[in-house]
Amino acid sequence: EERFLVGGTEAPLTPFTIAQVKALKIYSSLPLPYPCRSMDMTKKQNTMVLGEGAGCFCLEKGERPNALAYIIGIGFATEQLTHSVSLSPDGQCLQESMRSALESAGNPKIDVVITHCTGTIKGDRAELNAIEAVFGAQKPLLTNNKWQHGHTYGASGALNLGMAIEMLQSNTFQPIPYLDEANEVPEKLQT
């Protein structure tokens, strides 16, 4: 039997790490109920907040009666960067990885994308530009969980996967409280 335990964990709340993100001028200084304003494109300053987190999953090959979800496609890409924290304005590597994942999954209709947007102006814009380029007028609902716990670095992917599984199991879209959701929520979340 092929089983793999996968996950991510990180606790970057050290004075050194916080000093680094403050030096980069990406750490939030907003005195708001939600200081991390991920995906809020009206923000005038960077609003990244760091958080601690961990998530772990068992991946098994094939179909199982007790499966929480199925991975039906994967995608990945890289791009030449000009700086260690840079990203192209159109999120080229994000576009390539999403297109690759959609193609490997047979191009299904996507109900929701859980973004990685961290609350930085340039990073959030690049990711949203990439989503617009890939999906165009068929853009799915977008959400994020960093407003709840901040950017957990190495744990972010696992926490996003946990959020996706929870939405699929409850058939409930989890919106971001400070954003108006313009799209209609489908009756049933499937992908």
Annotate each language-model stretch with its function.
Residues E127-I131:
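Charged helix-capping and loop-helix junction motifs
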Residues L32-N107, D111-V112:
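Condensing-enzyme catalytic core mediating Claisen C-C bond formation in acyl metabolism
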Residues M98, L102-G106, I114-C117, I121, ...:
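Alpha-helix capping/termination and helix-coil
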Residues E1, A54-G62, L161-I165:
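Alpha-helical metal-binding/catalytic segments enriched in His/Glu/Asp
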Residues L5-M41, Q45, I74-S88, C117-R125, ...:
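Acyl-CoA/ACP chain-elongation machinery
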Residues E2, P108-V112, Q138-K139:
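Short acidic capping loops at alpha-helix termini that bridge into adjacent secondary structure
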Residues G62-E63, A133-G136:
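Short, conserved catalytic or adaptor-binding loops enriched in Gly and charged residues
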